[in-house]
């Protein structure tokens, strides 16, 4: 079976049998803000004392090769490569230990952000919620030690971000537990665990690639 491919019903393309795509429309996409100290510093923000999180709409999801569309409402759109976690079983008020067994897999996520609108608005829904603002890759169902996951972002082939889960302010199990004490996490939900330093604007004609090294990848052209 290794190396064989099958038709992906969501995109019409081929994907390896060792990977999966998430549901086309997850119930929710939970994103963690400022979970890498250096990223918080580069934006002039304090490191949070407890996890800061927000939601992206499922309509923001796109897949491999789909275009990130720059909206006319923004003059500064930036990439944010992240390690995403796909939930496999229901989590409500879960302990950190219990969250690990509930993970279906890990997934590359680009939390595309209209930075000027994020600074302008009192909350982040508009800045984070445009159609095409959440590219996601394949799900890797075998991923090893969560703390050793590494995310890399490349723009036009040049590395712009690199971050390890070991450098996160809050660990992945802690994040899942924390969120589950606020809202139930259901199968298919995605939790994006924050972006490392190095975020920067993207422009029409760029190609942005986010990879969880050796596990999941998504590459998208930019238009608009």
What are the residue ranges of the model-derived segments?
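Catalytic-pocket segment enriched in acidic/His residues
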Residues: 2-24, 39, 45-47, 115-224
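A short, gly/pro- and small-residue-rich
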Residues: 106-108, 207
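N-terminal accessory regions of nucleic-acid-interacting proteins
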Residues: 92-106
